[in-house]
């Protein structure tokens, strides 16, 4: 699945991704697959999966595409 980062607060370690087909999904820093400090920037295109979390659907296996 693809989407764009709506916002991400690196101090709090979470944010939201807007899915290409519509709707937002929660993303936690621990779901980001990259080396070093795991953070996202507004507008970045990402690929991800959706898993059921404690508080509902959330992004998993998040990879930056652009």
UniProtKB/Swiss-Prot annotation:
It comes from Thermotoga maritima (strain ATCC 43589 / DSM 3109 / JCM 10099 / NBRC 100826 / MSB8). Its main location: cytoplasm. The keyword Endoplasmic reticulum does not apply. PROSITE patterns: CSD_1, CSD_2. This is Cold shock-like protein. Changing residue 61 to N: No effect on thermal stability. One of its GO terms (molecular function) is DNA binding. Monomer.
